[in-house]
UniProtKB/Swiss-Prot annotation:
Modified residues (Pyruvic acid (Ser)): S25
Pathway: Cofactor biosynthesis; (R)-pantothenate biosynthesis; beta-alanine from L-aspartate: step 1/1
EC number: 4.1.1.11
InterPro entries according to UniProt: Asp_de-COase-like_dom_sf, Asp_decarbox
Keyword Cytoplasm: yes
Protein name: Aspartate 1-decarboxylase
GO CC terms in record: cytosol
Primary enzyme class: lyase
Localization: Cytoplasm
Function: Catalyzes the pyruvoyl-dependent decarboxylation of aspartate to produce beta-alanine.
Organism annotation: Sodalis glossinidius (strain morsitans)
NCBIfam families (UniProt xref): panD (TIGR00223)
Main subcellular localisation: cytoplasm
Family: Belongs to the PanD family.
Amino acid sequence: MQRTMLRGKLHRVHVTQVDLHYEGSCAIDQDFLDAAGILEYEAIDIYNVDNGQRFSTYAIAAERGSRIISVNGAAARCACVGDLLIICAYVQMPDEEARHHAPRVAYFDQHNQLQRTAKALPVQMA
C-alpha cells in the first residue's frame, strides 16, 4: 500500500506579491525551498490562513535571500499581499517507509525570516 505523506512544509510565510498575469505557479525564495526540501517545479498545496482558501500549484525559485512569496496566475485570486500561508509538498511511499518518515518543516516570523527547522510537528495538546 502507498501512503501520501507530508514531505516539506513552509509554516506561516507571508505573501509578498501577487501577479495575476504571470504564467502560473508560486515563486518562493530558494533558501525557503531548500529549508523545506521542496524542489523547483514540484507540486505544492497552499493553505491561506487569512481567507481559508486551499489551492494547488507548483513551486518556482525566487532569488535566494529575497524572502519572496509570490502567488501567480489564477492562484493570485486566492491571496493578497500580506496574507499568511502554509505551503506543503507531499510524497507517496510504501506503508512501511511511511511509518518512519519525518517531514522537513520550516518556521517563519512575520517578516518571512526563517526562525527554525524541524523534522517533526509538535504534538497538539488538549
